Design a protein with these regions (language model features):
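Active-site microenvironment for binding and transforming phosphate-containing groups
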Residues: 1-163
């Protein structure tokens, strides 16, 4: 992995550098605003972290990207295999509808330019997929339950069915 920020809060995947139309990265716990158990660069709103710290971290994240995303999409993961597509239906949904759509989701797929799909991992595995032909990206959170229950396969199947 290569450092994308001076403080190493964002790391890039060297293997993805040939694909300049997408931006793949991982974040670390460094360089943010959160305190205590969530110190310091926690970007997920589904923890006990201070909401203002999370918003500040998300803003810092977006400002660290080469191009400001239109949308930062973070699901409420449950170590399952639910896959959600971030498309016009999602983008046109109300805030409450979006929250409901992201409940129990461990993989996201999108073809929408400017959408930054996110997953959270600690000791789990991030799976990042890219369909160059159709310009579709996916990110899946693979814990042991998701791995045993084929989250990678479910995500690929959904991508194939839609695109």
């Amino acid at each position: 992995m290569i450092a994308l920020t001076e403080d190493k809060r964002m790391l890039g995947y060297g293997v993805m550098t040939p694909y300049s139309n997408i931006f793949c990265f991982a974040t670390t716990r460094r360089g943010g605003f959160s305190k205590g158990d969530y110190a310091s660069f926690n970007c997920t709103p589904y923890t006990g972290d201070d909401a203002e710290s999370v918003r500040s971290n998300q803003e810092l994240l977006c400002n660290s990207m080469p191009q400001q995303p239109k949308e930062l999409v973070i699901p409420f993961q449950t170590h399952g295999t639910k896959v959600e597509v971030i498309d016009e239906k999602y983008l046109n949904a109300t805030s409450d509808e979006r929250t409901a759509m992201l409940q129990g989701v461990d993989a996201l797929i999108t073809k929408e330019p400017g959408c930054c799909i996110c997953i959270s991992t600690a000791d789990c595995i991030p799976i990042l997929l890219y369909d160059r032909k159709n310009q579709v990206v996916a990110a899946a959170h693979a814990g042991w339950r998701g791995t045993v229950n084929y989250i990678a396969g479910h995500t690929l199947d959904r991508m194939r069915a839609l695109y």
